[in-house]
Each structure stands twice: as C-alpha cells, then as structure tokens.
Amino acid sequence: MSYAEKPDEITKDEWMEKLNNLHIQRADMNRLIMNYLVTEGFKEAAEKFRMESGIEPSVDLETLDERIKIREMILKGQIQEAISLINSLHPELLDTNRYLYFHLQQQHLIELIRQRETEAALEFAQTQLAEQGEESRECLTEMERTLALLAFDNPEESPFGDLLNMMQRQKVWSEVNQAVLDYENRESTPKLAKLLKLLLWAQNELDQKKVKYPKMTDLSKGTIEEPK
C-alpha cells in the first residue's frame, strides 16, 4: 500500500472484536468504580463495594459524612441549612467562591417560588441577590430567569420550568461537592469522568479529520454505531 492510499475502514464488528480481545484487569476497573463512589460521596455504596471487591478506598469513608449531609439537604431543597453547614465546616469557602454562594442563594429563591411564597421570594431577591446582580451580568441574567417564574400561574410549565426540575438541585449539589473537594485539596473529578471526557475529545479529533470509525453515540448505554 502506497503512502497516499488510505487504510481500509474498520467495521463495527471488527472494532468490537478488538475491544473484546483487550484484557483489562478487573482490579483496575474496580478501582475506577471505588474512585467514583468516593468522589461523589456515596458512602454506603462504597462500603458495600469494598466488601464485594476487596478494593480499599483512598480515604477514610467516615470523612464522607459531612458531604452526605450537605447533599441530602440540597436535594431536599433545604438550602439555608446546607449553607449553614458549609459555613460551619469551611468558614471561608463561600466567601472566596462568590459564584457558588450566588447559586446556593439562587436555589433558595427557587425553593421559595416552588412553595408559592411570592412575597418572601421578592424580598429575598431584593435583600440578598440584587447586589450580586449589579456586580455580575451573569448573575443578573440568572436572577432574572428565576424571578420570571413568578409571572406564571404554573411556573413548572413555563419556559423557565427547568429551574424547578429536580436536576437543578443536583446541579447545585455537584457544584458544591466539587468546591468542597477542591477546598480540601482532594480529587474533585472522578477518574471515570476524566476517561469519558478523553473519549469525547478523541472522537471529536477524528470527526474533524473526517475519519470514519465506529463511534460511541450514547455514553450511558455504551452504544456504538457503524462508521458513517
């Protein structure tokens, strides 16, 4: 084959055969799983996985308790309680991370709107969020989107209804979790997530070079499609 000739395109079946022939140590896979569970704060799952796999976590699992409490509060919509706990554990964190503090305050505003406490929501926005909105265009835009929910009888069905979705609470928790881990000088992104980002980067590079290859189109299901 000359230098100018292109190699034959690899089919999905050929690609899957190559993947199946790869030998990855189970212990390495188990360490990835344990790393994910610890980083995301899933203590009970990590304890159970340790017993099943024999893999020891990189940190004392008891140190996860505080993050678990914060997660439970945020996912229940108890934002003020979560802020108090964060301040008691890491007094300087929210002072040095103003966007994180704003997002927590914004989430409290969302919870007031969810509970149809209109007057309390307006007062909170004016006394707690207005100043940050004046200092940051990004914060102002987010605050305006949040307050726009008050214009609808059924805010859940409005164009801004995504703010009332439970995934919004999860988003705030993820931001808090990463900030706490960074503050404690601990790994804040699971190794598994880094590997998936590397996969997406590699596929993007191949796409830009117009290379045809079996592409993973659904990370959650591991779906791989034929070259196109």
From Swiss-Prot:
Residues 25-57 form the LisH domain. Its main location: cytoplasm. GO terms for cellular component: cell junction; cytoplasm; cytosol; nucleoplasm; nucleus; ubiquitin ligase complex. Signal peptide: none annotated. Residues 63-120 form the CTLH domain. InterPro entries: CRA_dom (IPR013144), CTLH/CRA (IPR024964), CTLH_C (IPR006595), LisH (IPR006594), Ubq-SigPath_Reg (IPR050618). One of its GO terms (biological process) is Wnt signaling pathway. Keywords: Cytoplasm, Nucleus, Wnt signaling pathway. It is found in: Cytoplasm; Nucleus. GO terms for molecular function: protein homodimerization activity. Homodimer; may also form higher oligomers. Identified in the CTLH complex that contains GID4, RANBP9 and/or RANBP10, MKLN1, MAEA, RMND5A (or alternatively its paralog RMND5B), GID8, ARMC8, WDR26 and YPEL5. Within this complex, MAEA, RMND5A (or alternatively its paralog RMND5B), GID8, WDR26, and RANBP9 and/or RANBP10 form the catalytic core, while GID4, MKLN1, ARMC8 and YPEL5 have ancillary roles. Interacts with RANBP9. Part of a complex consisting of RANBP9, MKLN1 and GID8. Interacts with CTNNB1, AXIN1 and GSK3B. Core component of the CTLH E3 ubiquitin-protein ligase complex that selectively accepts ubiquitin from UBE2H and mediates ubiquitination and subsequent proteasomal degradation of the transcription factor HBP1. Acts as a positive regulator of Wnt signaling pathway by promoting beta-catenin (CTNNB1) nuclear accumulation. Belongs to the GID8 family. This is Glucose-induced degradation protein 8 homolog. It comes from Gallus gallus (Chicken). The lineage of its organism: Eukaryota, Metazoa, Chordata, Craniata, Vertebrata. The gene is GID8.
